[in-house]
Amino acid sequence: MPLLDSFAVDHTRMQAPAVRGAKTMNTPHGDAITVFDLRFCIPNKEVMPEKGIHTLEHLFAGFMRDHLNGNGVEIIDISPMGCRTGFYMSLIGTPDEQRVADAWKAAMADVLKVQDQNQIPELNVYQCGTYQMHSLSEAQDIARHILERDVRVNSNKELALPKEKLQELHI
């Protein structure tokens, strides 16, 4: 099985909260697609609660689009990581990490403005696979956690696992 990009970086050295440009590729028509690692938690030390990350998934997708789309950028998807330490965001365009960090902080401020669980988009049996597994208060705790800390940039070059380590891990 090929080594995926997300596993070629040293998770023991990742900072959080932090933005990392995980991958950039071009479509056959020449459009740039960029994937960002939006790391909310320090891997293997912190984790977002399942109800909070689920609610954040519903809110974050819209709020990030409000703050990042435009000027050559259009978000394709924002999805939570299975490890519950962050989200992956795929988009058309190549915004720099600071632009993404600024949009992320603005989106977290928007999460704090949501006053009632009924304001969570698509929170119903028809549009959500586990519509009862939500917590606005947990999502807002996550947002506060981001806003209370400085959003940094994680560098692929600094986090790259050396070839020797990959061989040691039998990859």
Swiss-Prot record:
Known EC number: 4.4.1.21
Top-level enzyme category: lyase
Keyword Transmembrane helix: no
Catalysis performed (reactions): S-(5-deoxy-D-ribos-5-yl)-L-homocysteine = (S)-4,5-dihydroxypentane-2,3-dione + L-homocysteine
Alphabetical list of Gene3D superfamilies matching this protein: S-ribosylhomocysteinase (LuxS)
Cofactor(s) listed in the protein's UniProt record: Fe cation
Gene Ontology process terms (BP): quorum sensing
Domain of life according to the entry: Bacteria
Molecular function (Gene Ontology), one example: iron ion binding
Protein keywords: Autoinducer synthesis, Iron, Lyase, Metal-binding, Quorum sensing
Residues annotated for Fe cation binding in this entry: 54, 58, 128
Note describing how the cofactor binds: Binds 1 Fe cation per subunit.
Entry keyword Phosphoprotein: no
Function: Involved in the synthesis of autoinducer 2 (AI-2) which is secreted by bacteria and is used to communicate both the cell density and the metabolic potential of the environment. The regulation of gene expression in response to changes in cell density is called quorum sensing. Catalyzes the transformation of S-ribosylhomocysteine (RHC) to homocysteine (HC) and 4,5-dihydroxy-2,3-pentadione (DPD).
Subunit organization: Homodimer.
HAMAP family: LuxS
Family from the record: Belongs to the LuxS family.
Protein name: S-ribosylhomocysteine lyase
Organism for this UniProt entry: Salmonella typhi
